Amino acid sequence: MFSTTRLTTSAPRAPPHNGAFHPDSAALLLVNTRLPFKIFKTQHFTSEEERLVVTEADTGQRIVRKINGPPAAEEYARVVGAHVGDLNPMRFAATPVVVTIDGTDYVRSIQRANPDGSLTFFCAIDEGLVLRVVRGVDLLGNLERTFDTIRAEIGPFQLVMACDCILRNLEMTQSGAKEAVADLLRNNHVVGFSTYGEQYHGVHVNQTLTGIALGYPREGHDL
């Protein structure tokens, strides 16, 4: 899906840290630039009105046991118009749930339905949380409009570094939109990764594309 970019350097290649991969670790990159840039998040969902209140949860394991009182999988299936036995990754990708914080919807994606009727989530969950089911509308058009809006602010893109949720990839596969989206990303100089969770202004989100768009130097300004 994403383009790849090869960087050429005369510096020696750094080995892995102590020659191994490390769990519970992170790489932090700090960048200072005079280029015009924009940090952004985009998603393509419209929310429904019915509220789903988490009434029992194992927050440490990200498991919701009950929603609105009944078992979580049963209540979720009722709201989306499906049978519990039909709940699978494609269904969860098509109809995730969101929590609203300060008027902004943040997706809380479901990982799987469990044999005991509970639901395991990909991100933090808590009792009392109010969720709403959302449905995807025109992923490709949403992405085009997002790029157009950012371009109007910072000018033509030199590079866009993006993290795109793997569940969006599933949805694109299901809808047949993958090639059209790939063309759009290439045409907008997007490089990046399919990810298992994104972060935007300190909030952990799912099923979004987050990124940093970099423009060209403003007239009269050096890098």
Tell me what each language-model feature is:
Residues M1-L223:
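Hydrophobic alpha/beta core scaffold segments
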